[in-house]
Amino acid sequence: MAAVGSAVGLGNIWGFPNKMGASGGFTFLIIYLILAVLCGFIVMVGELAIGRKTGHGAVGAYKALSKKFKWMGWLGILSAFFILFFYCALGGYCIKYTVLNIGDLFGAGFGSNGLSGGEIFGNFLGSPAEGVIYGLIFVALTMLIVMGGIGGGIEKVCSVGMPALFVALLICIIRACTLEGTDVAVQILQADGSLVEGVVNGSALDGLKYMFSPGWAANVGYYVPAKAVVDGAEVSSIMVNGVAQAIVAYKSGAPSIFNVVSTAGGQMFFSLSLGMGAMITYGSYLHKKENLQKNALLIIIMDTMVALMAGLCVMPARFALDPAGNIGGPKLLFITMQNVFHSMGTLGPIFGILFYLLVVFAAISSSISLLEVIVAHFVDKARIEGKGDKRKPYTLIAAACVCLGCILVCADCLGSSGIAPANILNIAEPKNWAADWLDFWDALSEGVMMPLGALLMSLMIGWEIGPEFVKEEAEQSGHAMGSYGFFKVCVKFITPLCMILILYGQIKEFFF
């Protein structure tokens, strides 16, 4: 259950639904599932086998196989650090919004005080100190759980939290899909440059179409995939808060198949926590009786289910009640969804608390696995050197290091404070990696280090130590590795090839 918690995170809540809708809908889902089988399953079984065989975390596991692979473990630890820098910042944001909705429920002064989602988020970003405080609270929660160890803290939290997450998502899905659409008055920008009053029609069904329509979704490169109508005629763009935004029909703008494969692959590795040592670390705690194939398949299925359920919760609500709102990245959670809860009247704060609490849990279930990757290495090392149980001090030291990166991300305020990499390096037209510190750490980890780590691991198993190594370890459970023939072909040929394409696409997207 801890491994499932590692896989389920923020990438499921906003990343998967938004990328699925923007990159082909049902077509994206099919490509994602194919990659999950050809790459995700193969890499996960390999990482779990390495961890269980050696009984060590990422660095110790690779070192036990061969000293020349030790650096690959450090690559995983660096990835974990970089992800934690922005993950804890976003987790802190979610805590802030949980508190805010509690304030709305009881009419307290720390509620929204009648402000819109955009105004609330703008004020929050305008207060770096508040962001830092909530980010550090999230780091502290993660640290306390990891101090309890895999059995005393991590597994207990995930065993209770994961079922609760599914129930909370189900409640939100039922509510979201039964919402009546709201027609939003907007200013329509005509071809001649004049502005007229018009309407964007809200519909929960549009959210489902956005995610599941086969073929390419229309809103590639745009934030508004709805249709606006003036006097019975469709128009091309609208003004939202004084900014012109294009409106296009579904299926009108097609991304290349390569971009879809790359996007799906990057999402898969980030969502499944592959290529950063988390599954190696959790594998080291698995009993020999555990069926590695079954565990890997269960993790992939449950992770994908949560991602789809999150989409069924978020997208219908967003399209029904805020059809003219932005839908990308953090704004989906902290502007659009907050506007959705505002529009629900007295029930809004209740659903807001429920929603943001489940997002906090999804975030913390992943953050504890990331911190465990780091801590496990030093705990293993201390045990081997006869220094006893050093989990608590090493967890404290690792968390302190995470705090430094988290403070930088929070103080940057998503690039609005003037300390983003683009500002420091004086880049006039920054690429994705330089826009803010969140994107910088994301580009290094998700864009490069995670797919690179998975590629190197598959090459190591396929061509250096041999796939028989995984077969022998998998069959320690007493179950035959029925997928061995498939695993062998994939780990030697198909998975590395897919990984090279995904890595190239990720580097191209983030840096060029």
Give the role of each language-model region:
Residues 159-368, 382-394:
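Membrane-embedded translocation segments of transport machinery
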Residues 19-23, 56-71, 75, 89-151, ...:
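Inter-helical loop and helix-membrane interface segments of multi-pass membrane transporters/permeases
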Residues 75, 375, 381-401, 440-499:
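C-terminal membrane-solvent junction of multi-pass transporters and transport-like membrane proteins
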Residues 1-4, 31-66, 88, 317, ...:
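Juxtamembrane transmembrane-helix boundary signature
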Residues 129-133, 302-308, 352, 361-364, ...:
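Loop-to-transmembrane helix boundary motifs in multi-pass membrane proteins
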Residues 1-33, 277-278, 294-297, 301-302:
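Transmembrane helix-boundary motif of multi-pass solute transporters/channels
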Residues 1-3, 28-31, 68-81, 135-136, ...:
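Select transmembrane alpha-helical segments in multipass membrane proteins
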Residues 19-23, 49, 53, 64-65, ...:
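Membrane-water interface regions at transmembrane-helix termini and the short interhelical loops
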